[in-house]
C-alpha cells in the first residue's frame, strides 16, 4: 500500500486507522500490506526524534492495540496460510511508483511531474492515476552509463564464474568468488532517486571492490601463473561494439576505441579498487529545486520524497554539467590562451573532434609486451590531424599532420576516482622521472586546483587506500588539476559530493 508507506511514520497514527477502516468497509476481510525500509523508523533524517522522543511509535502501537477487536496484525506467512485466495494475477516487471519515475530521463521526469501535478486537481484523477506510470527500472543503465559499466562488469564475471564451475575449479575458491559476485550485485549503487545511490562514491567503490575480488579469485581458480598478461577484444559492455581488455596479474584495463579511445576502467588488483569508478555530471530533474531554493514548509517531519534541505550553502552556484565522460585518455584541443578556470568550469571550447570520436584499434602482441594501438584521422581547428595512442599500461602518443606555422594546444585528461579530497593524507606531490626523493615536495590535498608549468611529473597519493599514482612525461609539461564534484540528492538532502580528481597534462605541440 503506497498510502501506508507515506502514513507510516509521517502521518498521525489515527490517520492510519481511518485509512484501514475505509479499506475494511470497501473490502471486508482484506489484507493490507505494509513493507518498507526500517530506516524510516529512526535512521532517516529527523525520524529518530519523531518516532521516539516525540512518541509517534508508541502512539502507533497503542492505536493498533485499541483496535485489535477488528484489526489483526499479521505476517506474510500467516496471511498466506489463513487467507483464501481471491483469484489469479500476473504482475509485470515493475517496482514501486517513485522508482519508475526516477528511471525516466531527466527532461521526461520534469514533464512527468508537471503532468501529474496538473492531473491531481482533476476529479477523474483517483480513477485514472493507477494507469499513469513512469519508466522501466533497467533504463537506469541507459540514464547512467556508469551503472551499465558496473552491470556489464558484473555480468562478465558471472559468466567467468559459470565457466569455472563447468571446468571443475576448486569448490572452495568458486564459493568465495560467488559470494563476492553476489555482494557486487547489491543494487544500491546501480540507481539514483531520493537516495544518493550511484552518486555516492563509496557505493560504487564497494561494488567494484567485490567484483574485482571475485575476478581475482577466478584467476586463482583458473591456475594462472604468478606473472601473466593477456589482451582480448570483444563486446564487454553489450553495446554491439568491441572493447579491448588489457590485463595482467596487477592491473585490469578496459578501453573503448569507438568512444573516443577512452580508458574507462582501471582496476588495481592488490587493493580491489577501480581508479575509474567516476561519474559524469549531467542534468537531474531535482536541480530545479536547488536553483529555486526552498524548504519543506512547516518544520514537521517529512518523507524524504518531500524534503528540500541543503547540506551546504551556495549549491545553486556549484551545479555543473560535463560535455564528455569523466574518464581517461580523453583527447582535447584548446585555444592557446585557455585558463585552468575555464577548463575546470567546463567553459573551454573544444577545437577538435577527438573527444568522443571513433578510433581504429589494433592489438600488437610481442614476446615481451602487448599493446593496444588506437588511430584516428580527425580534425583540430579545421585541419586534418592524426592521433596515434598506444597503451601497454604505459601510454605513448604520436600526433601527425601538425601545422608547421602554428602550435596547437593539446591536452589529455585522466580521472582518478575513490581518492577523496579534504584530507592531509591524500595529496598531490612533485613526481620525478628518475630518482624519487624520500620526502617529495607536496602540492596540496587532492581537491586542490593546480596550474603547473615545466613539470616532469605529478603524483597522487591516498595513504588510507594505500596507493601512489604517478604521471611522468618525457619532456617538461604543463599540468592542470581540479576536482570533479556533483550536486546530488540523498536522503539527507542536497549535497556537494567529491567524485574524482581530473588531471590534464597539456602541451603546445
Where are these regions (language model features)?
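Terminal, compositionally biased non-globular sequences in eukaryotic proteins
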Residues: 189, 199-202, 206-226, 346-355, ...
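Acidic-aromatic substrate-binding/catalytic surfaces of carbohydrate-active enzymes
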Residues: 249-362, 373
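Extended lipid/amphipathic-ligand handling interfaces
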Residues: 385
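Surface-exposed interaction patch
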Residues: 412, 417, 425-437, 447-478
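Active-site and substrate-binding clefts of carbohydrate-active enzymes
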Residues: 3-251, 256-260, 268-271, 464-466, ...
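Beta-strand-rich recognition/accessory modules
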Residues: 349-382, 392-404, 454-509
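Acidic (Asp/Glu-rich), glycine- and aromatic
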Residues: 260, 264-271, 278-284, 290, ...
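Solvent-exposed beta-strand/loop surfaces of large extracellular or lumenal domains
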Residues: 421-443, 483-499
Amino acid at each position: 500500500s503506497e498510502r501506508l508507506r507515506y502514513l507510516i511514520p509521517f502521518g498521525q497514527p489515527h490517520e492510519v486507522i481511518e485509512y484501514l477502516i475505509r479499506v475494511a468497509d470497501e473490502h471486508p476481510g482484506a489484507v493490507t500490506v505494509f513493507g518498507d525500509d526500517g530506516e524510516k523508523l529512526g535512521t532517516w533524517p529527523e525520524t529518530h526524534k519523531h518516532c521516539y522522543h516525540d512518541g509517534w511509535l508508541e502512539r502507533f502501537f497503542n492505536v493498533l492495540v485499541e483496535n485489535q477487536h477488528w484489526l489483526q496484525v499479521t505476517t506474510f506467512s500467516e496471511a498466506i496460510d489463513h487467507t483464501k485466495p481471491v483469484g489469479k494475477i500476473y504482475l509485470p516487471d515493475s517496482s514501486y511508483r517513485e522508482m519508475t519515475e526516477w528511471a525516466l530521463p531527466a527532461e521526461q521526469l520534469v514533464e512527468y511531474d508537471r503532468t501529474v501535478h496538473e492531473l491531481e486537481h482533476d476529479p477523474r484523477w483517483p480513477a485514472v492515476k493507477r494507469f499513469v506510470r513512469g519508466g522501466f527500472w533497467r533504463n537506469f543503465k541507459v540514464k547512467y552509463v556508469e551503472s551499465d559499466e558496473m552491470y556489464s562488469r558484473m555480468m562478465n564475471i558471472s559468466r567467468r564464474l559459470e565457466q569455472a564451475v563447468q571446468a571443475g575449479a576448486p569448490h572452495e575458491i568458486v564459493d568465495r568468488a560467488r559470494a563476492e559476485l553476489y555482494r557486487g550485485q547489491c543494487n544500491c549503487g546501480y540507481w539514483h532517486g531520493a537516495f544518493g545511490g550511484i552518486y555516492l562514491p563509496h557505493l560504487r567503490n564497494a561494488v567494484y571492490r567485490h567484483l574485482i575480488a571475485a575476478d581475482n579469485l577466478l584467476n586463482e581458480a583458473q591456475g594462472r601463473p604468478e606473472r601473466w598478461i593477456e589482451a582480448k577484444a570483444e563486446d564487454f559492455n553489450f553495446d554491439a561494439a568491441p572493447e579491448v581488455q588489457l590485463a595482467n596479474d596487477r592491473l585490469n584495463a578496459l578501453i573503448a576505441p569507438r568512444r573516443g579511445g577512452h580508458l574507462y576502467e582501471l582496476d588495481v588488483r592488490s587493493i580491489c579498487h577501480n581508479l575509474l569508478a567516476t561519474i559524469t555530471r549531467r542534468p537531474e530533474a531535482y536541480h530545479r529545486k536547488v536553483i529555486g531554493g526552498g524548504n519543506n514548509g512547516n518544520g514537521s517531519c517529512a518523507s524524504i520524497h518531500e524534503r528540500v534541505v541543503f547540506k551546504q550553502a551556495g549549491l545553486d552556484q556549484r551545479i555543473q554539467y560535463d560535455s564528455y565522460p569523466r574518464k581517461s585518455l580523453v583527447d582535447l584541443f584548446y585555444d592557446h590562451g585557455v585558463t585552468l578556470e575555464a577548463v575546470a568550469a567546463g567553459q573551454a571550447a573544444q577545437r577538435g573532434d577527438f573527444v568522443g570520436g571513433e578510433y581504429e584499434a589494433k592489438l600488437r602482441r610481442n614476446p615481451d609486451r602487448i599493446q593496444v594501438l588506437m588511430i584516428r584521422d580527425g580534425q583540430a581547428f579545421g585541419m586534418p590531424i592524426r592521433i596515434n595512442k598506444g597503451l601497454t599500461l604505459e601510454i605513448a602518443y604520436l600526433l601527425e599532420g601538425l601545422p608547421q606555422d602554428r602550435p596547437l594546444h593539446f591536452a589529455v585528461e585522466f580521472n582518478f576516482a575513490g581518492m577523496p579530497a579534504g584530507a592531509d593524507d591524500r595529496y598531490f606531490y612533485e613526481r620525478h622521472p628518475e630518482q624519487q626523493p624520500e620526502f617529495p615536495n607536496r602540492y596540496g590535498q587532492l581537491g586542490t586546483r593546480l596550474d603547473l608549468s615545466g613539470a616532469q611529473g605529478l603524483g597522487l597519493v591516498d595513504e588510507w587506500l594505500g596507493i601512489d599514482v604517478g604521471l611522468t612525461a618525457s619532456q617538461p609539461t604543463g599540468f592542470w588539476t581540479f576536482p570533479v564534484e556533483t550536486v546530488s540528492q540523498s536522503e539527507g538532502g542536497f549535497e556537494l559530493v567529491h567524485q574524482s580528481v581530473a588531471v590534464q597534462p597539456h602541451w603546445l605541440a
